[in-house]
C-alpha cells in the first residue's frame, strides 16, 4: 500500500529555494557583464564583427 512521503521542513525548503535564486542571480550577472564588455569593445573572450 502506498504511503505519503514526509513533509519537507520549511527551513529546508527555503534553503533550496534561496540556492536556486542565487544561482540565477549569478548567471544573470555574468550575462550582463559579458554584454557590457561586448558593447564597449573591451571583451577579450568573445569575438564579434562590428
UniProtKB/Swiss-Prot annotation:
Answer yes or no on keyword Plastid. yes
Q: Tell me the compartments it is located in.
A: Plastid, Chloroplast
**GO CC term (a single one):** large ribosomal subunit
Question: Which InterPro entries did the record assign?
Answer: Ribosomal_bL32, Ribosomal_bL32_plant/cyanobact
Which keywords appear in this protein's UniProt record, sorted alphabetically? Chloroplast, Plastid, Ribonucleoprotein, Ribosomal protein
Q: Which GO terms describe its biological process?
A: translation
- This protein is called what? Large ribosomal subunit protein bL32c
Q: Which organism is it from?
A: Lotus japonicus
